[in-house]
A protein has these predicted regions:
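GST-like domain detector, emphasizing the conserved glutathione-binding G-site
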Residues: 1-127
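GST-like fold's C-terminal all-alpha helical module
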Residues: 107-156
Length: 156
């Protein structure tokens, strides 16, 4: 049975890109279906037809629908353990899940001030103290993970 990942625009939806990247990195076959975002009621209905939250991404696996990027990644990690999406060691896996949850639910100031838009020209930006604190915390997380777990592969 083919998995179908329903996503928004890859240029604007970092939430959509998370499970897309996990599926690609895991070598898991899937069909990609893109629904335009911010285009009106018809597209909102198309999203609601596949996602109870009315948001993308959503993963369809036969009769199973999973929505929310982190829930999708958890599902595919369980469904395809050979893909190695989570570390095998329980302590390392717990650490990875904790960081994933923090990345998933935190950093509101940074998300607000630096939303994903791959087509926007890059330039100097004045960030709030909260956004700078978010960036500093992300730097701490990444540094810690690379120092502790770099031997495990190229990913944090």
């Amino acid at each position: 049975m083919t998995l179908t990942l329903v996503i928004g625009n890859k240029n604007y939806s970092s939430w959509s890109m998370r499970p897309w990247l996990a599926l690609k990195a895991g070598g898991i076959a899937f069909e990609e279906r893109s629904i335009p975002l911010y285009t009106g009621a018809a597209d909102k209905k198309r999203i609601l037809d596949v996602s109870p939250s009315g948001k993308v991404p959503a993963l369809i696996d036969g009769d199973v629908t999973v929505w929310d990027s982190l829930a999708i990644i958890e599902y595919i990690a369980e469904r395809f353990p050979e893909a190695g999406l989570w570390p095998a060691d329980p302590a390392e896996r717990a650490h990875a899940r904790s960081i994933s949850a923090e990345m998933h639910s935190g950093f509101a100031a940074l998300r607000s001030e630096c939303g994903m838009n791959l087509h926007r020209p890059v330039g100097a930006k004045v960030l709030s103290d909260n956004a700078r604190a978010d960036i500093a915390r992300i730097g701490e997380i990444w540094t810690d993970c690379r120092q502790r777990f770099a031997k495990g592969g190229p990913f944090l």
